[in-house]
Amino acid sequence: MAIKLFPVTPEFAAEVGDVDLTQPLSPDDRAAIKAAFWKYGVLIFPAQSLTPEQHIEFAQLFGPLEPNINSYQDDVKQERIDARISDVSNLDHSNEILKADARKRLSGLANRLWHTDSIFRHVPARASLLYARSVAPIGGHT
């Protein structure tokens, strides 16, 4: 079954329907998703429940992944999720809410502001993928 696109606006952002990202994508679906990304810039895949491996496999559709910033920090434990995924949550390696003075929490405060990931790199990131495990019941259409 071919994917369906539901544009949020005519030129920017689209919701993608009739696709299950837990299953291997057909070559046609892969091409359609890439084309939609280049057309709309933001794609929304609602109601997906991905494992870290499935998330990584889907992300690789857009190209090679850059190293996670936590891989450069010796004092940051990254045992909660796959080290190839940047953890921008408010949870520590034991799934407990971070303390107010935790380094990870303090360094992540800037993520609350609009920004473009990896724009400082010589070759900036082509895309960023956000996988929300908990979305606000009202107004959560980010």
Residue ranges of each PLM-predicted region?
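Fe(II)/2-oxoglutarate oxygenase catalytic core
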Residues: 2-142
